[in-house]
């Protein structure tokens, strides 16, 4: 009996092993395609997903997987199509079936495309880093293991600025969107003057616009008198015509123009503001009326500057989206850890108590000195996790995305990854990027980042969006550290001296350091500084 049990156990083990082996799918063998890409549902997204997969399989193996539709699937095929509701919008399921097929099903929108990206990245060794910058290992045979992988994005909308977005594959790879993808006529922020242009309505109807210092003031940056019923009627007429021109799109922004303390202070508006404890109350009352008038549409509005804090009483309807902006916050530590950030966190937590439809516009950019060091990599993950925790469903990270900006490629890489999954290891993301993008120079540039980060925190000097290198000349950009940074860049360049592509990337990444040196060098030396130096010398 004991031998029988051992024999049965061995048979079960062999069966399990054989099942595991048979669950593998070979796409290419000895340079020849052995699989097909089958479109279960023929639509634009699935076709784009199929083409992306076909393209990269060919780059890896030189073999072309045929794309077919309206045909019976067979063993070894990759099936693109089908619904996986649990994955959510843009999510997907990769699953090896009992018929030895790989099913890529979608939770909606671009889920099938993102499923292909995950397949290429996680199981076929393709890594994408920046515009037209990727790595792969050529293979004559491509075999996939048994797969069961479901992913749901942390946010339904993910956006960042980057020159890399000019590469259509990059944009898909990092699962990024643009306002034009979501918002009707690209109307996603500061839209009051687009909906009711003051040039058109201001002369005849000045009462539509903010009452400030005793008079209504039409203008490109003026706000609306939100308690005036004629403003609501005029806005409805304008919006109705916009919706009819774009019947297939759902979302639009009805939001204040840029500028602070420009909201209407007529007696009626002021009364609502005082009752609600914030000018946002007027906005939400107005937006709720629009949301009731057009229940099949979604309206986004700003919680920005004067309207950042939530109202005390009125609650946004489910189809009212709150775009909350943290423009006034410092960036050297996470938002939860500095005074300016705490005001924003208070607002975020307040909005999250009355809405689960929040869009956060976060800033990681230096507007005044765009080509200068901005070492905020250590706060990215904590801030994005904070947003996720507080019912944020849409996220825009406004960063310096220009070529030659402060590690702009790495910043976009990390943000793209973290907006999809905020609970990845951020330091591992940095190391992975550096190793893939900078090659043998990576250790030196990693040291550069960590030394500058530590110096920033030790200096006590805030990092903000209107910063200057000069303000850090006694801190993270002091002469001793500048010497260290340059030595690290020298070592980085030497490490890849024989590779012109990698060398060029390092030289571009050095520009912010060089810019800082030039800015600091042209700083006037004050008389007080000279006297202090003379005193120390004597």
Residue ranges: model-predicted function:
Residues 1-24:
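Bacterial Sec-dependent N-terminal signal peptides
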Residues 528-535:
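Conserved small/polar residues in nucleotide/adenosyl-binding loops
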Residues 33-34, 44-52, 56, 85-285, ...:
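Feature activates predominantly on carbohydrate-active enzymes
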Residues 342-440:
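Structured mid-domain segments that build the active-site/substrate or prosthetic-cofactor binding neighborhood
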Residues 66-88:
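Short, well-ordered secondary-structure micro-motifs within conserved domains or adaptor modules
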Residues 447-468, 472:
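Long, charge-rich alpha-helical interaction segments
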Residues 305-327, 372-376, 405-411:
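Substrate-binding cleft/loops of secretory-pathway carbohydrate-active enzymes
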């Amino acid at each position: 009996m004991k031998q029988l049990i051992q024999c049965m156990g061995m048979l079960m083990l062999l069966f399990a092993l054989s099942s595991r082996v048979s669950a593998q799918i070979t796409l290419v063998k000895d340079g020849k395609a052995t699989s097909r890409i089958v479109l279960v549902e023929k639509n634009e997204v699935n076709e784009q997903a199929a083409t992306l997969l076909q393209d990269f399989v060919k780059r890896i193996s030189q073999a072309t997987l045929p794309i077919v539709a309206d045909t019976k699937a067979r063993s070894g095929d990759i099936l693109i199509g089908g619904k996986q509701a649990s994955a959510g919008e843009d999510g997907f399921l990769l699953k090896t079936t009992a018929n030895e097929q790989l099913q890529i099903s979608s939770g909606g929108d671009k889920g099938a495309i993102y499923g292909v990206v995950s397949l290429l990245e996680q199981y076929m060794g393709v890594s994408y880093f920046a515009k037209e910058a990727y790595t792969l290992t050529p293979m004559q045979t491509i075999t996939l293991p048994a797969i069961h992988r479901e992913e749901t994005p942390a946010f339904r909308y993910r956006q960042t600025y980057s020159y890399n977005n000019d590469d259509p594959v990059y944009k898909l790879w990092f699962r990024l969107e643009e306002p034009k993808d979501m918002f009707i006529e690209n109307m996603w922020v500061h839209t009051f003057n687009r909906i009711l242009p003051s040039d058109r309505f201001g002369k005849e109807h000045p009462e539509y616009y903010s009452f400030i210092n005793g008079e209504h003031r039409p203008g490109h940056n003026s706000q609306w008198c939100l308690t005036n019923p004629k403003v609501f009627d005029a806005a409805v007429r304008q919006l109705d015509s916009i919706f009819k021109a774009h019947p297939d799109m759902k979302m639009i922004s009805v939001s204040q123009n840029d500028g602070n303390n420009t909201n209407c202070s007529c007696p009626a508006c002021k009364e609502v503001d005082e009752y609600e404890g914030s000018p946002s109350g007027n906005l939400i009352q107005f937006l709720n009326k629009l949301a009731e008038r057009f229940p099949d549409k979604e309206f986004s509005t700003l919680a920005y500057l004067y309207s950042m804090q939530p109202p005390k009483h009125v609650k946004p309807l489910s189809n009212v989206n709150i775009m909350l902006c943290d423009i006034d916050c410092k960036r050297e530590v996470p938002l939860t850890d500095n005074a300016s950030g705490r005001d924003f966190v208070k607002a975020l937590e307040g909005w999250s108590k009355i809405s689960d439809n929040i869009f956060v516009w976060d800033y990681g950019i230096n507007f005044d000195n765009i080509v200068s060091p901005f070492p905020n990599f250590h706060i990215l993950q904590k801030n994005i996790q904070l947003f996720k925790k507080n019912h944020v469903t849409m996220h825009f990270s406004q960063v310096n995305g220009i070529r030659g900006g402060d590690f702009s490629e790495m910043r976009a890489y990390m943000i793209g990854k973290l907006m999809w999954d905020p609970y990845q290891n951020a330091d591992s993301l940095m190391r992975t990027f550096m190793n893939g993008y900078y090659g043998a120079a990576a250790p030196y540039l990693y040291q550069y980042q960590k030394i500058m980060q530590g110096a920033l925190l030790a200096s006590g000097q805030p990092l903000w969006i209107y910063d200057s290198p000069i303000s850090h000349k006694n801190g993270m950009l002091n002469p001793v550290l500048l010497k260290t940074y340059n030595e690290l860049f020298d070592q980085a360049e030497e490490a890849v001296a024989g590779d012109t592509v990698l060398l060029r990337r390092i030289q571009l990444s050095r520009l912010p350091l060089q810019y800082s040196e030039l800015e600091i060098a042209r700083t006037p030396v004050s008389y007080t500084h000279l006297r202090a130096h003379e005193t120390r010398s004597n």
